[in-house]
């Protein structure tokens, strides 16, 4: 018996359909918490399993599974990426000193917690200021897991070639989101960095378009680290 929190997919995208692997495996029963809200799947995965003689039970721990998959469900309903924001700040609301220099105010336990949050998201994002000031790796460490795609929101695609973001762009998907350029276009530079142009000058509109573009790329959730 296979237990899953979501209906196995039946469409072909970046990876083969899950139902094909289940059918080939010889599994005779699938217990799922609920249906996949994606119109490409919604009920079709279960139907295909039943067609091949596999018993399907739906509804076990439905509420708990909905909480686990909250970001995915939201992104499918709204057609844009779910955003989580992380801030390490003092009680008086500061994330840096008066000179703009950040200080360590978190401990080992909180850093491990943050890296757990990173691995649960499909992407991680910072602004250009944070990238230039801290030269962050934006990867999953301290815990086991695959590093998510990395995003930098910037007014320009000019990022120092010496930055960790650029140097490791061929190892982890790396995207710079800019406001100018032709609306909703994506290009890939020789260094491996992708540049997404939203065509929006307004910062608020730029972020909205970027989240729609990210969803189109199969990114249901993004973890934003400010400061």
Task: Label every PLM stretch briefly.
Residues 1-64, 180, 201:
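Zn2+-dependent cytidine deaminase-like catalytic core
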Residues 28, 220, 225:
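Short acidic/polar active-site loop segments enriched in Thr and Asp
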Residues 61-76:
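Short, structured interface segments
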Residues 12-13, 40-41, 67, 133-134, ...:
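Residues that form or flank phosphate/diphosphate-binding pockets in enzymes
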Residues 9, 93, 224:
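Conserved S/T- and glycine-rich ATP-binding loop of Class I adenylate-forming
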Residues 4, 32, 56-59, 97, ...:
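General beta-strand structural signal in soluble alpha/beta enzymes
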Residues 74-78, 82-220:
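Active-site ligand-binding patch in enzyme domains
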């Amino acid at each position: 018996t296979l237990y899953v929190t979501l209906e196995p997919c039946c469409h072909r995208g970046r990876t083969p359909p899950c139902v094909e692997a289940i059918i080939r495996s010889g599994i005779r029963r699938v217990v799922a918490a609920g249906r996949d809200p994606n119109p490409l799947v919604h009920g079709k995965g279960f139907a295909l399993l039943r067609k091949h003689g596999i018993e399907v039970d739906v509804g076990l721990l439905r509420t708990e599974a909905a909480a686990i998959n909250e970001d995915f469900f939201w992104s499918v309903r709204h057609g844009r990426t779910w955003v989580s924001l992380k801030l390490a700040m003092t009680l008086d609301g500061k994330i840096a000193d008066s000179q703009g220099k950040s200080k360590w105010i978190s401990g080992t336990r909180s850093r491990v917690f943050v890296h757990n949050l990173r691995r649960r998201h499909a992407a991680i994002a910072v602004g250009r200021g944070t990238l230039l000031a801290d030269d962050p790796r934006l990867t999953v460490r301290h815990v086991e897991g695959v590093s998510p795609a990395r995003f930098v929101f910037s007014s320009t695609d000019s990022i120092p070639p010496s930055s960790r973001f650029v140097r490791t762009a061929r190892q982890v998907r790396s995207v710079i989101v800019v406001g100018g350029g032709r609306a909703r276009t994506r290009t890939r530079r020789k260094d491996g960095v992708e540049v997404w142009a939203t065509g929006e000058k307004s910062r608020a509109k730029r972020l909205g378009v970027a989240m729609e573009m990210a969803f189109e790329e199969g990114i249901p959730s993004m973890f934003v680290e400010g400061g």
